[in-house]
Amino acid sequence: MERYELLKDIGAGNFGVARLMRNKETKELVAMKYIPRGLKIDENVAREIINHRSLRHPNIIRFKEVVVTPTHLAIVMEYAAGGELFDRICNAGRFSEDEARYFFQQLICGVSYCHFMQICHRDLKLENTLLDGSPAPRLKICDFGYSKSSLLHSKPKSTVGTPAYIAPEVLSRREYDGKTADVWSCGVTLYVMLVGAYPFEDPDDPKNFRKTIGRIMSIQYKIPEYVHVSQDCRQLLSRIFVANPAKRITIREIRNHPWFLKNLPRELTEAAQAMYYKKDNSAPTYSVQSVEEIMKIVEEARTPPRSSTPVAGFGWQEEDEQEDNSKKPEEEQEEEEDAEDEYDKQVKQVHASGEFQLS
C-alpha cells in the first residue's frame, strides 16, 4: 500500500472512483480505480478483474494488480495520459473521416482481440476508450465492469450499457450475443466521431429515453447534409446498424471492409496482429498476481471496513484535497447511478407497454 502516492482524482465511473497515483520506487504513473469494500465487491467486480487480467493487447488498458486498503479495493491499471476519446471529440466538435477511421481501426482491433479471448465488453463508448499521450495517439479500451466471458459465464440477457450506444437486441430482455452487440456500439462510436452527435437521440429531446429506444428499434438515423462522409463509410454504417443481429456485419467482415482497410497502419494489419492471437502471447501481462491471489484479495475486500468513519485518501496515507465547493467523486457517482436507474425504469416501461417488439 505504501508503494504509491496520490497525485490527483481523474474521474468517477459506474462502480468507483479513479485516481492518478505514482509508484514511489519506479516513478511510474498508474490509474487506480477504487471500489468501496463490502457489498459493492460482488461477482461483477470479480468478473471485471479476471476478464481484464486475461487481456494483453496494445489497444487495451493494461491490468497490473489489485490491492486492498482499509476502506477500498483498488484496481491498478496503466495510465493513459491522453484522457478520454470523448473529451477529444468534445473539443474538436467532430473528426475528419480520416481521423475517425484512424481511431475506429484501433477500436476494432482491440474489440476483435477481446472477442478472440471470448470476452464481450458490453459497454463500448467514447468514455471507455482512452488515449495515450503520444502525438499520434494510441486508443486503449478500458472499463470491463459489464464484460462477460463465454468461457466462464452464461449468455448475457440483462439490459446493460449506455442508452445511446445500446443495440436493439439488448433491449429485448432475451439472451443475445454480446459480441454482435459490441459491433453495434462500435458503429455508434464511429458515427459520433464523424458527426459529433448520437445517431439515435433526438437532438431537441436528448433525455427522452423512450424516443431514443424507438429510434434504435426502427433504425432511425441519418447523416446531416453538412457532414461529408464517403459512400464506403455510409455503407459500412448501414451494415452495422441492422436490427437483426444475425444479419449485422461481423468484426471479421469489418476488418476486411474497403473503408476500414484504407490507410491501415502496419501495426494493425492481420499479419502484425497475429502475435497477440498466439497461445504464447508475448505481449507483457504486467500482472504478477495469479488468479488465486486476486480472488483471495477480492474475497478480503468483501468484508466491510471496520469503522463507518471515512478514511482520508481512501485508506492511503495522503489526505483528500477536495475544495469545499467542489463535488466529491462519490456524489458524481451517485448522480450517474440515479440517471442509470431512470434509464432502467424507462426500459421496463417500454417493455410493459409492448410498444416495441423485436422480430
Swiss-Prot record:
Gene3D superfamilies associated with the record: Phosphorylase Kinase, domain 1, Transferase(Phosphotransferase) domain 1
This enzyme's EC code(s): 2.7.11.1
Keywords from the named record: Abscisic acid signaling pathway, ATP-binding, Cytoplasm, Kinase, Nucleotide-binding, Nucleus, Phosphoprotein, Serine/threonine-protein kinase, Stress response, Transferase
InterPro entries to which the protein is assigned, alphabetical: Kinase-like_dom_sf, Prot_kinase_dom, Protein_kinase_ATP_BS, Ser/Thr_kinase_AS
Domain of life assignment: Eukaryota
Activity regulation note: Activated by hyperosmotic stress.
Pfam family membership, one: Pkinase
Molecular function via GO: ATP binding; protein serine kinase activity; protein serine/threonine kinase activity
Gene Ontology CC terms: cytoplasm; nucleus
Sections of the chain in a coiled coil: none
Known tissue expression: Weakly expressed in roots. Expressed in roots of young seedlings.
PTM annotation, UniProt: May be phosphorylated.
Region (Disordered): 299-359
GO biological process: one example: abscisic acid-activated signaling pathway
Protein kinase domain boundaries: 4-260
Keyword ATP-binding: yes
Catalytic activity: L-seryl-[protein] + ATP = O-phospho-L-seryl-[protein] + ADP + H(+); L-threonyl-[protein] + ATP = O-phospho-L-threonyl-[protein] + ADP + H(+)
KW Transferase (keyword) present: yes
Active-site positions on this chain: D123
Induction, per UniProt: By hyperosmotic stress in roots. Weakly induced by hyperosmotic stress and abscisic acid (ABA) in leaf blades. Accumulates upon incompatible interaction with Xanthomonas oryzae pv. oryzicola.
Residue sites binding ATP per the record: I10, G11, A12, G13, N14, F15, G16, V17, A18, K33
Similarity field: Belongs to the protein kinase superfamily. Ser/Thr protein kinase family.
Record's function text: May play a role in signal transduction of hyperosmotic response.
Protein name: Serine/threonine-protein kinase SAPK7
Organism: Oryza sativa subsp. japonica
The encoding gene: SAPK7
